[in-house]
Structure formats: C-alpha cells, structure tokens
UniProtKB/Swiss-Prot annotation:
Gene Ontology MF: a single term: glucose-1-phosphate adenylyltransferase activity
Pathway, per record: Glycan biosynthesis; glycogen biosynthesis
Catalytic activity: alpha-D-glucose 1-phosphate + ATP + H(+) = ADP-alpha-D-glucose + diphosphate
Protein name listed in UniProt: Glucose-1-phosphate adenylyltransferase
Organism of provenance: Arthrobacter sp. (strain FB24)
Amino-acid positions noted as binding alpha-D-glucose 1-phosphate in the UniProt annotation, renumbered to this chain: 164, 181-182, 199
C-alpha cells in the first residue's frame, strides 16, 4: 500500500438477495451463514483487514438486524488507534427515500467520506467468497493514474448475462475501453475465446473523483444509481477507468489450486456449490490458510463430538466440515457442512448437504443434497432430498438442479409410511468414501456393509426391507 495514501473502505451490504430465498427471508444476503462458522460478509471484511485497511464502513439496509449484531459482536477494532468497522444503516440524509441503488447508498452516505477525508476509497461487495489483497489493487490504481479501477475475474462466456462485462483497450490492457452491465452475449478474450472479463464488484476510486461522479449521477434522470451500471460507465466514457486482473493478486499461503478462486454465491445453486468446493482433501478454496485468515465470531459451544448411538451404531463424518457443538450420535455424515450445535441421531444419514446452526436430525432420517437453515427439527424416519415432488408438496423449495432448501425454523411434518420406507431404503448404503477406500479389499468392504446393516437394524429396518 502506498504509505502516503489514506484509504477508506466502504462495504455494500444492503442487498436483499431475492435469488437466495428462502435463506434471505429473515436476513440480509451478506448475513447468510456460510461454511459452518462464518457469515458471507466475513470474507470481504477479512480481506480488507488482512490488507491493513482498518477504517471501514458497512452500508446496510434490508433486514439487517442479524448482520448488524454479527458485525458489532465480531468486528471490534481499536478505536484508540483510529481504526473502526462501523455498520451504517440508511439514514435519509439526502431526501426521504431509502437507498435506491448501490451508488445512491454511497451518495446518501457522503458524510462518511467527508468525515474520513481519504485520498482513496475502496468499494467492495459483501456477498462473494474469495481471498484478495486490496493493497495490491490500490498500488496499481495509483501507479496507472486511473480515477476508477475495477477488479476483474475471468468467467465462461455463457455467464456474461450475470456480470458487468469489461473490454480492455488493445494498446493498454490496464485501461477499460468498454463496460456493459449484464449483456445477453459478449465476445471472448483474444487469449481465450471461451472466457470474458467479469467485474468482481470491487472498485478503487480517487476519493474526489468518486464524490464528483456521485453528484453527477444524483442529478441524472436516466439512471439506476448503480455502481456497475452507471458510475463505472461514467469513468469509462471519460477515459479514466482502469482494470485490475485478479489473477495478478498474490495471497500468502495460497496454492495454485485456490489462489484465483472467486465465487458469486447469489443463487441457491452457487451457494450450495461453494460449500461443496470446501470439503475435499485438496479443496478448490482452502479455509485453512493461516497466513490470510478468514475471521469470524468465536463460538462458545464445546468441541464437536462423535459418539455411538443406540444399538452401538457408530457416529462418523467423512469428507465433511463439522463446527463446534456438533454431536453425531450414531449417524453418518458424508460430503457435508455442519454448522454449530447440529445434532445427528442414531442411524440417520446426511449426504452432500449443508446444515446450519441447531438443526436436529432424528433417528433413521435421511437428508440428501439439501440446505437446511437454522433451528429446523427433522423428525425420525423423515426423508429430505430423495423425492422432489414430495418435498415441494411439503412447502420446501427445490431448485432445478435438485437442491432441496428448508427455511429458518421451518416445520417438517411427521413422515407417513411411504416416506419411512423411502428413508429406510437408504440406511443400508455404504458411504462413497468408504466404498472408494475398500474397493480393492473385499473383507473390509464386507465389514463396511455390515456396519450399514447394523445402522438400519438399530431403527428396526432389516436388510431385506
């Protein structure tokens, strides 16, 4: 970071997150729990803090109570040293409207920029999963002479309608020649025709230039008051917009496999996929990089516990992330992420799923390819994620790709005989990880099969059922 530049960071955290419903029915999108112990906003804030930017304001609006509480309980800075992370809701300082867009959110909060009097303003989104050293981006911004710089990541061409698309100047690859927000199609890169440069929603501005642009935008009638749709094109048209290639960002402790990882988790399917990215032995995104930690609120729950259940059934978790306070009592968890204080009962199975805080899985229940929000109780013998039509009939959301989603505290009806039979048919199955490990060892494979039979028998299901 240039030592003679004062930097203020602004985190845009007012998003409603309609595409993440029902996970956002009771909270703002940046406040959605993620990866067992975190909330989505922790990634943006950790990246800023690790970049040594310690004057941060978080602009909130939509159902922000849990998000504001998380920030106040987790992100306590040393104000005696002039550092702070302040959650700032819409205040109607300019007119009587709430935030009308991301640019309007900053415009209505210009007092924060005036009070901090920075040279540089870093603006970031609050709902992406990645690691990034913003100091490296600021360094390029200052050296290039640009007034605005956009961080860019390569994406497949078929995703152009989901992002702001950047075309670079042919003579100066650090300069933006054109910027189009979510076009129906776009040409590919010269170096790789199958990809395009997408805006990451992270920006660096000269502070005075940003303030001027926001005033101009506020006076326009033909604007959506959007950072990507209106403010960045303003700088592009003036020839003052630069681009920062995310692949140049160098994070301590990163691997070739995860150093350019970036996920927009704005949909249920992408949110689910991001969790599945975490659980392999060599994950696409490594949560365990201690040189660039992702910070969050420390749990007061005790360590996780794996114990035998009824009938001497073995409690185990394979290829999974298990947070504090989890108790797996004779159940099997595979390829899943379990948040704090989850309980998994005797002979139950949780496969390829995401369970948030205090979810309870009853005896002999089966959960498959599901996301279950906080405080849901799954009764004994229930089957979730095995029959999409049955799930929809009970009021659960099922995505086109087959992910079943239960909202916070949603009631799960007691299973009927057909549902109990459906779950019972899955209790004998040997976990995929054990199948792979015992493939060439018949005796071990037979032993694993007997474990499955014992689990089923513990809840009164025979191998012939």
């Amino acid at each position: 970071m240039p030592l003679n530049k004062k930097v203020l960071a602004i985190v845009l955290a007012g998003g409603e997150g309609n595409r993440l419903m029902p996970l956002t029915a009771d909270r703002a999108k940046p406040g959605v729990p993620f990866a067992g112990s975190y909330r989505l906003i922790d990634f943006a804030l950790s990246n800023l803090v690790n970049s040594r930017y310690l004057q941060i304001v978080v602009l909130t609006q939509y159902k922000s109570h849990s998000l504001d509480r998380h920030i106040s309980e987790t992100w306590r800075m040393s104000t005696q040293l002039g550092n702070y992370i302040a959650s700032v809701p819409a205040q109607q300082r300019v007119g009587k409207s709430w935030f009308l867009g991301s640019a309007n959110a900053i415009y209505q909060s210009l007092n924060l920029i005036h009070d901090a009097n920075p040279d540089i303003v870093v603006v970031v989104g609050a709902d992406h999963v990645y690691r990034m050293d913003f100091a490296q981006m600021v360094e390029q911004h200052v050296a290039s002479g640009a007034k605005a710089t956009v961080a860019a990541v390569r994406q497949p061409l078929n995703m152009a309608d989901q992002f702001g698309v950047i075309e670079v100047d042919q003579e100066n690859p650090q300069k933006i020649a054109a910027f189009v927000e979510k076009p129906s199609s776009t040409p590919g890169l010269a170096a790789d025709p199958t990809q395009f440069l997408a805006s990451m929603g992270n920006y660096v501005f000269d502070a005075d230039a940003l303030v001027d642009a926001l005033h101009v935008d506020a006076e326009r009638l033909d604007t959506k008051h959007d950072m990507g749709g209106d403010i960045i094109p303003y700088f592009v048209n003036k020839g003052e917009a630069g681009v920062y290639d995310f692949t140049l960002n160098d994070i301590p402790g990163s691997t070739e496999r995860d150093r350019t990882y970036w996920r927009d988790v704005g949909t249920i399917d992408s949110f689910y996929d991001a969790h599945m990215d975490l659980i392999s032995p060599m994950p696409v995104f490594n949560l365990y990089n201690s040189e660039w930690p992702i910070y969050t609120r420390q749990s007061i729950s005790p360590p996780a516990k794996f114990v035998r259940g009824q009938g001497n059934t073995v409690g185990t978790a394979l290829d999974s992330i298990v947070a504090s306070g989890v108790v797996i009592s004779g159940g099997i968890v595979e390829g899943s992420v379990l948040s704090n204080d989850v309980y998994v009962g005797t002979a139950s199975r949780v496969v390829d799923s995401v369970l948030m805080d205090k979810v309870q899985i009853g005896e002999g229940a089966v959960v498959n390819r599901a996301i279950i929000d906080k405080n849901v109780k799954v009764p004994a013998g229930a089957a979730i994620g095995l029959d999409p039509e049955r799930d929809r009939a009970r009021g659960f959301k099922v995505t086109e790709s087959g992910i079943t989603v239960l909202s916070k505290g949603q009631a799960v009806p007691e299973p009927d005989e057909a549902e109990r039979a459906l779950s019972a048919a899955n209790l004998h199955l040997v976990p995929n990880a054990i199948k792979a490990a015992t493939e060439n060892y018949p005796a071990a494979r037979d032993s694993a099969a007997k474990v499955g039979e014992a689990h089923a028998a513990a809840v009164g299901v025979s191998s012939n059922d």
